[in-house]
Amino acid sequence: MQRMVILGATGSIGSSTLSVIESNPDAYSVYALVANTSVEKMLALCETHRPQIAHMVDGQAAKSLKQRLPTSLNVEITTGEDQLIDIVSASCVDSVMAAIVGAAGLVPTLAAVKAGKRVLLANKESLVMSGRLFIDEMRRSGARVLPVDSEHNAIYQALPESLQSNIGYCELEKAGVSHILLTGSGGPFLTSELASLASMTPAQACKHPNWSMGRKISVDSATMMNKGLEYIEARWLFNAADDQLKVVIHPQSVIHSMVQYLDGSVLAQLGNPDMRTPIAHCMAYPQRIQSGVEPLDFFKVGQLSFSEPDFNRFPCLALAMEACKQGQEATTVVNAANEISVQAFLENKIKFTDIAKVNEACLSQVAPQSLNSIEDIIRLDLQSRTYAAEWVKKI
């Protein structure tokens, strides 16, 4: 029986993880559920899954949950960063699903890595922000990190076992790998007139053609910043050079990514666009379990199409790739700026096309500096958020 902590339990990935657990009740149990402010959802999850601990990042939400949760459930309610670190580090915990969206997931995810846990990494921002610090800590502690993002999970499955067991330090060329091909659907605005993008609403941006996701990641998919962050994450996970990474537009979201080998072979992972598949793969690796996902029907799929990304349409993708070339400071800055600009768009404070403008303005201000600790990263993250917020006000 594998005991799990789910960071971001009330979100999309958290819900999918709990669904996989429900499909395999004899193999997994929930030790702790972690959320930010969603008291109603946490109440329901506690009643269904009976965790030992329910942790709310927001202190007021924790008080509300404590008042409303029946004592008969015998669930301990906690709040505070130190308590969260204790939860992911607990000796009884086998696996941690790291699914808190954004920079907020960095500290608990890194704490799980330091504790040597099996970390199912859905929080791409952790690697985007901390990069080498994260990878080195993983090697020091002996933590096993398994990528949950459908693209990175696909790449992982298409790599030889020798590279799967050496995440962060892969020698791609020695293993015969020539390129990693990251696929992306292009989002809801792939074929929209460029002139119309400025008038796109949050509701339109959040209407992804294939995937069911949260609002922030849905907007990131519409701008393709999500693919840019995944590009950075792939660089760290697979120790890939810029010339070994390519982005491919694939509107059907059936091929989740590919690995191209020196002999001309291309290995791809295919499946229906449902996050329960990569989640189940990570939970059970190296075994396979039921995910609850319908098998892919090739006759219904019919055709698969591919194209190069248009950087005029997707400037955020170009910015993220440029930040990756510049280094750790730049990726930390662009991630922070993007979180602020996307939130401003969702609140109707800026236009869809202003997201890239804010991100570019912040990236242009990156100054050389050393990021030698988590404190350095958090400080730069906060500085970048402040600068991005100022730009939002100017627009």
From Swiss-Prot:
One of its GO terms (molecular function) is NADPH binding. GO terms for biological process: isopentenyl diphosphate biosynthetic process, methylerythritol 4-phosphate pathway involved in terpenoid biosynthetic process. SUPFAM superfamilies: 1-deoxy-D-xylulose-5-phosphate reductoisomerase, C-terminal domain (SSF69055), Glyceraldehyde-3-phosphate dehydrogenase-like, C-terminal domain (SSF55347), NAD(P)-binding Rossmann-fold domains (SSF51735). Keywords: Isoprene biosynthesis, Manganese, Metal-binding, NADP, Oxidoreductase. 1-deoxy-D-xylulose 5-phosphate binds at residues 124, 150-151, 185, 208, 221, 226-227, 230. Its EC number is 1.1.1.267. Pfam families: DXP_redisom_C, DXP_reductoisom, DXPR_C. Mn(2+) binds at residues 149, 151, 230. Pathway: Isoprenoid biosynthesis; isopentenyl diphosphate biosynthesis via DXP pathway; isopentenyl diphosphate from 1-deoxy-D-xylulose 5-phosphate: step 1/6. It catalyses: 2-C-methyl-D-erythritol 4-phosphate + NADP(+) = 1-deoxy-D-xylulose 5-phosphate + NADPH + H(+). NADPH binds at residues 10-13, 123, 125, 214. Belongs to the DXR family. HAMAP family: DXP_reductoisom. This is 1-deoxy-D-xylulose 5-phosphate reductoisomerase. It comes from Shewanella sediminis (strain HAW-EB3). The gene is dxr.
